[in-house]
Amino acid sequence: MVRPRKLMILAGAAAAGGVVVRHGRRASRGHPMPGGILVGDAVVYDTLSRLLLGPFVARIAADVATVAPDGARVLEVGCGPGHLSIRLARQHGLEMTGLDLDPAMIARARANTDRAVNRGGRRPSLLVGDVAALAFPGGSFDLVVSTLLMHHWADPTGGLAEIARVLRPGARALIWDFRPGVRPHPFGPRHAHIPDPVDHTRGSRLRVVKATPWPWPWRLTLNPADPTGRADKSP
């Protein structure tokens, strides 16, 4: 199985904060599932993600909740059908903003939100947008999160720089993505050539503090930018 890992990022330079990133796709159409399969229909992707990613989303939500301050303003980049944003808003009381490049996916996320809030809880804000040009003022968020998508961004370093910009001083970024060097997949050969996510932090005002095992993905912890671009990796 292709294993993702999490990046925990604290913004450096002018914004000593952090965000979570998970959005922005390359020219390819469709939404990535584990193993590199691209699903082109938002409804089909929503159904598959419920069936295949439910435990993963639950673990991520629990992990985010341990990091986010009470009532924190949180941006999810690449929210897809909204499962993580909805869970974090309803169950953990976070002020969630979910962002996705695909209008059809945001429509699906809004429909899922309508059903979820009927059972009570906070409602996330869901918007169409691109990590390459985040439509938020600087210092807007206490936390940014993203799952399994950074390797699809056209400009990962630029996306991380945008995340650093919208983080408030002292905030964090949590990013889950696949490890480099995974075996090729017949439906997603690009996953055989995934670069190390740490490489994209150089020049983005973010730096990796450590990489540690997470229950089944990997987690990278990033702190304020180091001008040397060094990263400490823990097995």
Q: In which residue ranges do the predicted regions lie?
A:
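A short SAM/SAH-binding and catalytic strip from SAM-dependent methyltransferases
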Residues: 143-154
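Short amphipathic, positively biased membrane-proximal segments
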Residues: 1-34, 230-235
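Class I SAM-dependent methyltransferase SAM/SAH-binding core
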Residues: 75, 81-133
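Conserved alpha-helix/loop element of class I SAM-dependent methyltransferases that forms part
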Residues: 52-70
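A short glycine-rich, Lys/Arg-flanked "PGG" loop and its adjoining helix->strand segment in the class I
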Residues: 157-169
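C-terminal alpha-helical "lid/dimerization" subdomain adjacent to the S-adenosyl-L-methionine
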Residues: 25-38, 48-53, 174-227
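A short acidic, Gly/Pro-enriched loop at the edge of an enzyme's catalytic core
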Residues: 132-143
